[in-house]
Amino acid sequence: MSSLLRKMASKKQRATEILLILKKLYPGATCSLDYQTPVQLLVATILSAQCTDERVNKVTPALFQRYPDANALAYGDRQEIEELIHSTGFFRNKAKNIQGACRKIVEEFDGEVPQRMEELLTLPGVARKTANVVLAHAFGILAGVTVDTHVKRLSQRLGLTKATDPIRIERDLMKLIPQPDWENFSIHIIYHGRAVCAARKPLCGECQLAHLCPSAQAS
């Protein structure tokens, strides 16, 4: 076996061990955004950019009560939508993207959120992260690995990727993790990033992944 293949096999084994440990640590881990329909999940995920899921969940009840579906959001009052989502940050751009995405859903997809990655990526404000979340949690379709700030940070610290670009990170992780666990991996990594492996002061001394983590061993 070549050194490259041995390295890949070693990374795969570590990724498997990491996920097994995280599943035990966070047995109830799931998407933490509140939603009732695919379009509501799409909107909530757009709002979650540069914002916590907790904050998004405080905003969406009033937003979805006023604008419950794609048609209502697409042709609703822009200023009112901006006011309702103001606390999530970047509210003008988010309102523009939400309305643009919902308008396209209404006009080109018969009011239904598309279930194909290529089609989702044509919606304003939707990149692979948002598309992966919607496909996995609204439709049970595993098209890739969701890469948010936690997944990016922890995957690098754990030595699973050297890439900095989210698309390259996703490709690296897809090679290491079996497809049925693609979204499981992201969700559990996100939980661990929030609880233990923070950006500025990771709690390496308390981390149950420390023995598998090059960054913890180097610190």
Curated annotation (Swiss-Prot):
It comes from the Bacteria. One of its GO terms (biological process) is base-excision repair, AP site formation. Residues 117-136 form the HhH domain. Keywords: 4Fe-4S, DNA damage, DNA repair, DNA-binding, Glycosidase, Hydrolase, Iron, Iron-sulfur, Lyase, Metal-binding. Pfam families: EndIII_4Fe-2S, HHH, HhH-GPD. Its EC number is 4.2.99.18. It catalyses: 2'-deoxyribonucleotide-(2'-deoxyribose 5'-phosphate)-2'-deoxyribonucleotide-DNA = a 3'-end 2'-deoxyribonucleotide-(2,3-dehydro-2,3-deoxyribose 5'-phosphate)-DNA + a 5'-end 5'-phospho-2'-deoxyribonucleoside-DNA + H(+). This is Endonuclease III.
